[in-house]
Amino acid sequence: MTVRNTCCALLLGCALIPLIIACDKWENETVESTYQGIITPDPTYNFKRAGNSSVDILECKLLKEAVDLTYRHLHEANFTNEELYKLARGYYENGEFGLKPQEEIATSSQHEANRAQLLAEVEDIFTKSCELSGYGKPNASMIRNTPAEEGKGGYLGVNIGDANLCFADAKGVVVAELFQGIADGSIYLDKVLNIHLDDALFQNEALRMAHQNAEVLPGRNYTELEHHWDLAYGYYQYWLPYTQGNGLAILRDSKINLYNAFARGRGALTRYRYDSVELQIKNIRKELSKVVAVRAMRAFVGENTEANLAEEIRNALFFISQGCGALYALPFTRKEDGSSFFSYAEVQTMLEELTSGRGLWDAERLQGTTDTEGALQHIASTIGQRFGIALEEVKRNR
């Protein structure tokens, strides 16, 4: 064999490896796609004043750390004693370095009317996690070691020692995923689109004048308007993974479009071109709202969910629960004119459809058509219609 033929054979062999890996699965094993799109380096978001950085997004990282710690404890449902329960509550209520997740839920003026209900839902998530943990019961460990089944909460996995263990309630909902969805929508997305990029800020004459006079905040190197823009970019980072698209044409340019909008908007702010700033805000609303919609739709009808649903309903519950959590972000999206794509009441209706009757254990209903109330295609189609996205656009060609 020639050197050229040898190289071709090696390349062909390497090309087949991902196909073999992606097709390997065993009975009763959760199937998760191994496909990855082309990974490109992230561009640098860097602005300076007098030679020093004028960007400070530390707040975003510190708040996310407290959210992540809260989620981890809920995900493990390990409240087998009061000390562990108080630890998780502490991360949620007191946070880290003064940034408290509980105080940051739905704080924008557009969504403060729903704040009390969202806080109540988080309390319900803690309550269900306590029940799954056996908190306050003498046989707590035995309760936590109970596998989930229809009508009975417990763990999802082959056994309690599984690395990817999660816990579902009696309806089959992995409640920790609801918390993550609430955080993604009512904290991160709300801060990006409804707080730090709100039209009222950048149309405020006093803030514009202070910005043009380079009146930096006390002890800082940025103006108030600059900081609002940068915080929006900082909180957007926690939605950045969903822009990748895994080969979906509908998200092919989302990552670079959003980066360009943030960078151009910041640059326009530096040059006091407020008309351009407002244009980039509209671009961010449009592109990021599309990302939010696609993320929710894929959780319901993407390849991971469909493959596992066809194999074994237990294996699909985690992915469907991620979809249930993703619904909470929909009211925090914004059209170019500033209005929301979905109301909180509409999201509640979709959640009620999914969890009615046998809940997520009802595989036959879940696998229904777009005309079947409570079917995954029906929910995904409802979302897509509002955003102008077809179901076929969120399914990767296999």
How would you describe each model-predicted region?
Residues N28-R398:
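Mature extracytoplasmic or organellar-lumen-exposed domains after removal of signal/transit peptides
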Residues C14-A15:
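Hydrophobic alpha-helical transmembrane segments of integral membrane proteins
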Residues M1-L10:
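Bacterial N-terminal signal peptides that target proteins for export
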Residues P18-A22:
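C-terminal motif of bacterial Sec signal peptides marking the signal peptidase cleavage site
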